[in-house]
Regions:
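A residue-level marker of the well-folded mature domains of exported/periplasmic proteins
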Residues: 6, 21-342
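Bacterial N-terminal signal peptides that target proteins for export
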Residues: 1-9
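Hydrophobic helical h-region of N-terminal Sec-dependent signal peptides
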Residues: 11-13
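C-terminal motif of bacterial Sec signal peptides marking the signal peptidase cleavage site
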Residues: 16-19
Length: 342
């Protein structure tokens, strides 16, 4: 009897398990949406983004609006070329060590390429060597470096551009007078070349024009204004000023305005644009300024970087991005308007 009861209980248990299994199997169809959790299709854009080459761009900083224009050119070209562009720079153009630290930080990210505008043409050499050792192509832009590591340098011919400024000054002064020269620095390639281009041209072609300077204001408005005021105090007969970048010439304009000088007795020539210079040219306070192509510089450095990433090994030593002269008669011309920034 006991055996019969056990047999019956066992049969009931088997039946119950079978029933449970059947009941559990029923909702399987309702779990079909789980299959939609497979992330293959939705993750496709992530894979595309990960495949984009990462280009590090270390600029000279954001002290002047010039660099915002360069950044725009670089970022827009990066989008066009299918690259991720990280455009950075120190707070001022005197921050050499912070810029070197930024280089080291970008090196650790293992970028596909580096674009670099040096604040000090010599100081970056050891760090750039590390990029070369890691087989990361380097493109110099705006300010070159004293090194063979960069595959090319994308820049204005600053010697020729500053010589043009000297010619405009010499012609306006009738070949005689005294001109104060204020440059942003004597360590970057742009500072060195602009000072050389202006002074050499003036000395060669206009020997009766005396040069006061160059003196260096770090591209800072206040410092450059103080230098201009000191030059004027020590040289009552100064009748011209050349400022080698946006901040340098901006300081000159501030000094002349603050001292309430007779603007008709001064010829002021600058470099680059920005709203202050545009207004000064339109008002007649400033004769004119040499215009670089900042958007073109930014775009072209990304173009060259992408060529290197794709395996190109032969490059022109310099990619000349050109320059224009802007004065009251030409500032509204289409070609000049295309390179102005505010």
């Amino acid at each position: 009897m006991a055996q019969k009861r056990l047999l019956i209980l066992g049969s009931v248990a088997v039946f119950a398990l079978s029933a449970c299994s059947s009941a559990a199997a029923t909702p399987v169809a309702t779990q079909a949406p789980v299959a939609t959790q497979a992330p293959v299709a939705t993750q496709a854009p992530v894979a595309t983004q990960a495949a984009l080459p990462y280009i590090s761009i270390v600029s000279k900083g954001f002290q002047h609006q010039f660099w915002q224009a360069v950044k725009k050119g670089a970022v827009d070209e990066g989008t066009k070329e299918g690259a991720t562009v990280n455009f950075i720079g120190p707070n001022t153009e005197q921050d050499v060590q912070p810029q070197l630290d930024m280089l080291s930080t970008e090196l650790a990210k293992k970028p596909a390429a580096l674009c670099f505008a040096a604040l000090d043409s010599k100081a970056a050499g050891p760090t750039l060597q590390k990029f070369a050792d890691a087989k990361i192509p380097v493109i110099a832009f705006d300010s070159g470096v004293d090194s063979t590591i960069p595959l090319t340098t994308v820049a204005t011919d600053n010697i020729a551009a500053a010589a043009l400024a000297a010619d405009k000054m010499g012609e306006k002064l009738g070949g005689k007078g005294k001109v104060g020269v204020i440059i942003h620095d004597q360590t970057s390639r742009t500072g060195i070349d602009r000072a050389k281009g202006f002074v050499d041209e003036m000395t060669k072609k206009y020997p009766n024009i005396k040069i006061v300077g160059p003196q260096y204001g770090g591209g800072d408005l206040a410092k450059s204004a103080d230098i201009a005021k000191a030059m004027l105090a020590a040289n009552k007969d100064i009748n011209g000023f050349f400022g080698g970048n946006e901040g340098s010439i901006g300081g000159v304009l501030n000094a002349v305005t603050e001292l309430h000088l007779d603007q008709t007795k001064l010829t002021i020539i600058g470099y680059d644009s920005g709203q202050k210079q545009i207004d000064a040219i339109n008002s007649g306070l400033e004769l004119g300024a040499v215009q670089q192509n900042p958007i073109g510089i930014g775009a072209k450095c990304v173009v060259e970087a992408m060529l290197a990433i794709k395996g190109q090994t032969t490059f022109d030593k310099v990619v000349d991005t050109g320059f224009l002269w802007a004065d009251k008669t030409t500032i509204n011309n289409a070609d000049v308007q295309a390179v102005l920034y505010k």
